[in-house]
Curated annotation (Swiss-Prot):
One cellular-component annotation, GO: cell outer membrane
Reported function: Assembles around the rod to form the L-ring and probably protects the motor/basal body from shearing forces during rotation.
Lipidation, N-palmitoyl cysteine type: C21
Protein name, UniProt field: Flagellar L-ring protein
This protein's UniProt keywords: Bacterial flagellum, Cell outer membrane, Lipoprotein, Membrane, Palmitate, Signal
Family per record: Belongs to the FlgH family.
Assembly information from the UniProt record: The basal body constitutes a major portion of the flagellar organelle and consists of four rings (L,P,S, and M) mounted on a central rod.
Gene: flgH
UniProt GO MF annotations: cytoskeletal motor activity
Organism: Sulfurimonas denitrificans (strain ATCC 33889 / DSM 1251) (Thiomicrospira denitrificans (strain ATCC 33889 / DSM 1251))
Transmembrane segments: none
Bilayer topology: Lipid-anchor
GO biological process, alphabetically ordered: bacterial-type flagellum-dependent cell motility
Length: 240
């Protein structure tokens, strides 16, 4: 009974174990469906512009002279991501310790006050010539250093999600690129000031507060370099 049970489940366990040691083999895809906020927004109705008599500025949504920077919710602003990271740190530690212990006095002692007994004990200790001594030395020295230099430059279009009470904008944007079965995902979010947006409706990522920038790839390269979930579990509990 037990043998039949093992023969039945052993292949299943082997398949599960081997599948855990490999990454997900599904190919990456891009969802071309419109975002949820686009579906929820009603279609815009055409509004005619009216011109005031004797005025060159005009009225309506497209006046002749106006600032075309992003100002409202769902307006688009271009974020120029230019991040450089440089770090260098080093450390060293050295510890040394030395102990020495010597015990003399011989192997025999006398608690009495008789001079003859004390003399005899002293002679015995001289003949035996016993004593105790120990020496211990330990030393530790460690040194390490790390240097990192990375740069990332690109542009992402983001939309204004919320206009805060103080006039600042919370923006969020995402870009996905699929080339030769390699998917690149760039996502950004943060708070910006409307005064930092230039006339070309652009803003630098260094002018963002609470900036969060995500860049990752999906595809064959990721599958080749990523560890399977079975390997991760084994390494998490492996004590050595």
């Amino acid at each position: 009974m037990i043998r039949n049970f093992l023969l039945f489940f052993m292949p299943i366990y082997a398949i599960l174990f081997l599948s855990g040691c490999t990454a997900n083999l599904s190919d990456p895809e891009i969802d071309f469906e419109p975002p949820a906020y686009v579906e929820e927004m009603p279609s815009k109705e055409d509004n005619k512009d009216f011109t005031s008599v004797g005025s060159v500025f005009g009225q309506g949504e497209n006046p002749l002279f106006s600032d075309h920077k992003a100002m409202h919710v769902n307006d688009i602003v271009t974020v120029i991501i230019s991040e450089n990271t440089q770090s260098s740190n080093s450390g060293s530690k050295q510890i040394s310790e030395s102990d020495s212990l010597n015990l003399g006095g011989g192997a025999f002692t006398s608690a009495g006050t008789n001079s003859a007994v004390n003399s005899a004990v002293s002679k015995l200790n001289g003949i035996a010539n016993l004593g105790f001594g120990s020496t211990s030395d330990s030393a530790y020295k460690g040194q390490g250093s790390a240097t990192k230099d990375a740069s990332f430059t690109t542009t992402v279009s983001a939309r204004i999600v919320k206009v805060l009470q103080n006039g600042n904008y919370f923006i969020s944007g995402k870009r996905e690129i699929l080339v030769d079965n390699q998917k690149q995902i760039i996502q950004i979010g943060g708070v910006i000031r409307p005064y930092d947006i230039d006339q070309g409706n652009r803003i630098n990522s260094s002018q963002m507060s609470e900036a969060k920038i995500l860049y990752k790839t999906q595809g064959d390269v990721e599958r080749a370099t990523d560890r399977g979930w079975g390997t991760k579990i084994i390494q998490s509990v492996w004590p050595f």
